[in-house]
Amino acid sequence: MRIAVMGAGAWGTALALSLCASTASSHQVTLWTRSRQHLADLVSQRINRRYFSAFPLPASLRLTAGLEEAVEDAELALIVVPVSGLRETLREIAASGKKIPVIWGCKGFESQSAKLPHQVAEEEYAGAAPYGVLSGPSFALEIAQGLPAALTLASRDGEFAREVAAQLHAPRLRVYSCTDVVGVETGGAVKNVISIAAGICDGMGFGSNARAALITRGLAEITRLGLKLGGRMETFLGLTGVGDLILTCTGDLSRNRRVGLALAAGRSLPDILQELGHIAEGVHTAREVLRLSHLLGIEMPITKGVCSILDDGVPAGQAVEALLNREPKSEIY
């Protein structure tokens, strides 16, 4: 299959490396970057120095900074840009006149609009071609290393989801299919917020019991919001729900967890993000999720606590105390 990977960040580069290395399918892969300077570095070095300096880009991987060139003969576009760049990328693909199926790998809600990626696609790409989302517990570095992983490809077009999942499936990358786009996207977005909270919990030395409780109650928040938005319960118990949540709340490669650890140490958010050097989607997503929870009348105390730290300057310890001192209630409600 001819695949255009749109975005040469960590996740886009990892997917491109994985697709090129696949022995199960013979893919022709193009990696697109918006930056011509980045392209020049990739071409001259044949490595992505910023993210994966230890992994040479294979000779078969085509590189370009021209969007029309990237999608010209592609049979599938994998859009791997932050949520903030999804709308523009979809709009540019549509403007190219190439009506090719698209899959995105970003996780979060669009800032200001609080829209999930599929809602952005409905506005910018509806009717052009089938589309869907690729999500699940996956650190880009481990995908680049060829370590085993399992993901879910969701599309409202079930046949399309099954066909693309089969194409992306590889010996060490198992890809499942489903039709619950809302559930998959909600799990992938909100888990980043819970991951910040988990980092705060670990950074303050609260131990394994507290972390387990936080992850479990975080899953409850994800499920409440997801069901209200139209997702299915079983999705939140799968790879893109509890699976992704566990990984990002416990793995040392999680950017959002690292933000939480630094907040617990008393560091300022601007300094944390500057040192991180990469986007931590949970920071932006937290605000949109909290706004949605108010609009929909959903109780999300962990999300509220994270936002109080990020936006209101509440010390991490004080926010945790506020959570612990909430009125007792039934676990299931």
From Swiss-Prot:
| Location in the cell | Cytoplasm
Name the GO terms of the biological process aspect.
carbohydrate metabolic process; glycerol-3-phosphate biosynthetic process; glycerol-3-phosphate catabolic process; glycerophospholipid metabolic process; phospholipid biosynthetic process
- Keywords of this protein's UniProt record, alphabetized? Cytoplasm, Lipid biosynthesis, Lipid metabolism, NAD, NADP, Nucleotide-binding, Oxidoreductase, Phospholipid biosynthesis, Phospholipid metabolism
| Principal location | cytoplasm
Would you tell me the Gene Ontology cellular component terms? cytosol
Q: State the EC number(s).
A: 1.1.1.94
Give the reactions, separated by semicolons, that this protein catalyses: sn-glycerol 3-phosphate + NAD(+) = dihydroxyacetone phosphate + NADH + H(+); sn-glycerol 3-phosphate + NADP(+) = dihydroxyacetone phosphate + NADPH + H(+)
- Where does this protein hold sn-glycerol 3-phosphate? 107, 136, 138, 191, 244, 254-256
User: Which pathway does it operate in?
Assistant: Membrane lipid metabolism; glycerophospholipid metabolism
Asked if the Swiss-Prot or TrEMBL record annotates the protein with the keyword NADP, the reply is: yes
Q: What does this protein do?
A: Catalyzes the reduction of the glycolytic intermediate dihydroxyacetone phosphate (DHAP) to sn-glycerol 3-phosphate (G3P), the key precursor for phospholipid synthesis.
Q: Which HAMAP family match?
A: NAD_Glyc3P_dehydrog
* Homology family: Belongs to the NAD-dependent glycerol-3-phosphate dehydrogenase family.
Which NCBIfam families has this protein been placed in? PRK00094.1-2, PRK00094.1-4
What is this protein's name?
Glycerol-3-phosphate dehydrogenase [NAD(P)+]
- Give the encoding gene's name: gpsA
